[in-house]
């Protein structure tokens, strides 16, 4: 009898231990979406694929802590960003490294894109053709900013960051070709300096960004802080999110790089100008804070039809 009781105690203890939640607070309602969750903790070099029970289904290991983007591709490969510290770009979301792992955790391609005057940051996006879109911050010097009509009072750090979108075509194990490019600095308007080419009435140019609109920042170099980039293959359009502007922008991806630097060309005839923007009408002199609809948003994305 004593042996039986001891056995039952051991069995119940083991059962309780196995039944305990070892991965933190867990909620899995009947109506929850039946899918996996991809997680890359900010202070870890690990990436986890979890099921709805909180169990680790698969795991990848990098030598870099994450940037701010990770994707599980249809073929089972893992595409992620890694963080490389850059003293010239000190803001949340800095990456600088892109890595591609196969299902068995083999690193099959990597690409470094960070230097003293530029860095990949926040989001990337895998395109259907195998190319990769990425957000890049590049330095506009004080002279370049003034030439573009920046008010000197809005140059508190002596420079500003241009936000750039690059489409790269990976090859080899650590290389890529840039096959398409878009820059916000090509699509600015300002009403401060009438001697500059981009001088105009801000309210009459909602398809361009007011270079002197300062929102939720003290005119620092990081005046836009774009944090998300997504692609719609049916429309061949991009949606770009600016946390500091509290706006999202729709951009034509069908343009050539040359057209993307202008206001003409592409499927929609607008070049690289905004096709649509939403979130903060005050940013283009069409509203005030009373009718602002976005506030420091992250990760807008396209919703499938239906």
Regions found by a protein language model. Name each.
Residues 1-22:
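Bacterial Sec-dependent N-terminal signal peptides
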Residues 20-306:
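Histidine-/acidic-rich catalytic cores in large beta-rich domains
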């Amino acid at each position: 009898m004593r042996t039986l009781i001891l056995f039952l105690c051991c069995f119940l203890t083991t059962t309780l231990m196995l039944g305990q939640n070892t991965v933190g607070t867990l909620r899995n309602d009947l109506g929850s979406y039946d899918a996996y969750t991809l997680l890359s903790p900010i202070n870890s070099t690990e990436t986890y694929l979890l099921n709805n029970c909180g169990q680790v289904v698969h795991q990848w290991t990098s030598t870099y802590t994450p940037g701010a983007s990770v994707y599980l591709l249809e073929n089972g490969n893992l595409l992620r960003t890694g963080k490389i510290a850059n003293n010239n770009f000190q803001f949340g979301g800095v990456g600088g490294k892109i890595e591609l792992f196969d299902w068995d955790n083999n690193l099959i391609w990597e690409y470094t894109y960070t230097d003293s005057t530029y860095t990949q940051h926040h989001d990337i996006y895998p395109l259907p053709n195998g190319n990769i879109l990425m957000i890049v911050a590049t330095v506009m010097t004080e002279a370049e900013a003034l030439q573009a009509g920046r008010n000197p009072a809005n140059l508190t750090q002596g420079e500003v960051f241009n936000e750039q979108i690059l489409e790269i075509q990976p090859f080899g194990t650590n290389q890529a070709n840039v096959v398409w490019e878009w820059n916000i600095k090509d699509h600015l308007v300002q009403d401060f300096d009438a001697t500059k080419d981009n001088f105009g009435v801000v309210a009459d140019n909602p398809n361009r960004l007011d270079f002197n609109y300062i929102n939720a920042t003290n005119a620092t170099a990081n005046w836009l802080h774009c944090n998300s980039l997504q692609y719609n293959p049916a429309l061949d359009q991009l949606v770009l999110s600016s946390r500091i502007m509290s706006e999202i922008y729709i951009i034509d991806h069908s343009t050539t790089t040359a057209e993307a630097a202008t206001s003409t060309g592409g499927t929609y005839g607008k070049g690289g100008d905004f096709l649509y923007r939403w979130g903060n009408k005050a940013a283009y002199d069409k509203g005030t804070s009373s009718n602002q609809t976005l506030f420091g948003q992250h990760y807008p994305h396209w919703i499938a039809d239906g």
